[in-house]
Every structure is written in C-alpha cells, then in structure tokens.
Amino acid sequence: MAARAVWRRGLTVVTLSVTCVGCGHLGAAQQVPVNPVGVADLKPTQPDPSAGLVAVRRGFDAKKYPAIAIVTFPVTDSGLMNKEEAKLTVTIPAYFQLQIVQRLRATNAFSRVDLVTNGTAAPSGAGLLRLEGRITRLAAGDDTSAWVPFSGYSRLGDRMKAQIETSLVDTRTGQVMAVTADRREAPNSGFQTAESYVEESFQAMARDLVLFLERLAKGEVARSN
C-alpha cells in the first residue's frame, strides 16, 4: 500500500508538471527581430527590456502628448500560408489592436486612447500621437508536439513565428518619433491549439509594447538591457 501511495504521488507530480509545461510565460518566447526595417530615418536597433528593439528620436518628449490613437496593424507577410494562417491574417490585426488599447487605457499613461477602426480616418492635431505598424511575420506552426511522461518531448511541432514593427507618429507634423520591432518564436507545447498560442503571443507583444509606451509617457528614455 505504501509503495502504491508513493507511485500515485509521483504520478500526480508528473501530471502537474506536464500541465504546466510552457506556463511560465505568455505565448512564445521573445526573440531578436529578424531584419527590422524601421521607418524614414529611424531603425530599431537599441535593445529594450520589454519592446524588443527600439529607436527614439532625439528630443522626443511623450509627456507633451496627452492623447494617442491606435490603428490596425495589417499583416504584410507574403509567405505561403495554410488555411488556419489565412484566417488569422483576418482576425489577429483587430485582436492585437484591441489588446493594445485595453492595456494602454488601464495604465492611465494617456488621458485619451482612441481605437481607430478600419475605414475610419485617423484623428490628427496637436498633442496627439498615432501608433501604427504592421505584422511582418505570422506563422501559426502547429499543435502536434507530443509529450511522453518521464521522457520529455518525442516530437516538437513546427514553430510559431510572429513579428511586428511599430511607428509612433506626431499627427500634427507627420514625423515618426519612435519605432519598435518585436518577435516571438517557439514550438507549441501541444497543450493548446495553434490559434490560441498565436493569440497568447500577440497578447504578450501588446503587453510589452504598452510597458514601453508607459515608460515613454512618463518621460523615461529607452533603456538597454
């Protein structure tokens, strides 16, 4: 009986460990962005503790801008996509935009955070920033990773890959004041669908981008890791 109890406790520990595989962070792991382009004369090259790679125009003071408008990020990845990935190119832009808006509003870093819907002209004027960008990589990977108790993974599914580039624009002058690039990439653990893994990865990118914007709004300069 004692041996059976020990075996059951061991099985419970293994089950809990398997359940928690990959739960230490949200979505895929952050990676160095691949060949970020930037905008105009700004290219994201400086490592940031949250937003990946960034560049901030000299003299930019975000405290002078009480409002910010968030537009939808189109998917510009021209690679071959399967049916599920094609569906995500339609749903993820609005999902990501909403994640940014909700998280940024919760910080109270700006007195007004506008969500700009597709087909609506982005607001402009003094004291207003516009966050725009594009999703340059979107590959859902798959959820076919196989975990074998006591042995580890016998197979890892194709890697989920997502990369974004953003621009922070002064809407009065049209000048780009800051740019960022972030990338998430990792195989799916197999404990969630490919779609939910992609969504979690974009949640994480929204969270970390907002952390960067919050620091800018407080007048803090971009820091190196």
Model-derived regions, located:
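Envelope-exposed proteins and targeting segments
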Residues: 64-71, 100, 109, 127-131, ...
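C-terminal motif of bacterial Sec signal peptides marking the signal peptidase cleavage site
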Residues: 20-22
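Surface-exposed short loop/turn segments
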Residues: 32-34, 113-175, 192
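Extracytoplasmic/secreted envelope proteins and their assembly/folding machinery
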Residues: 93, 97, 101, 107, ...
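Sec-exported extracytoplasmic/periplasmic mature domains
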Residues: 100-109, 140, 186, 210-218
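Short secondary-structure boundary motifs at beta->alpha junctions and helix caps
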Residues: 152-163, 168-215
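Bacterial N-terminal signal peptides that target proteins for export
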Residues: 2-12
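A structural "domain/chain start" motif
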Residues: 24-99, 211-225
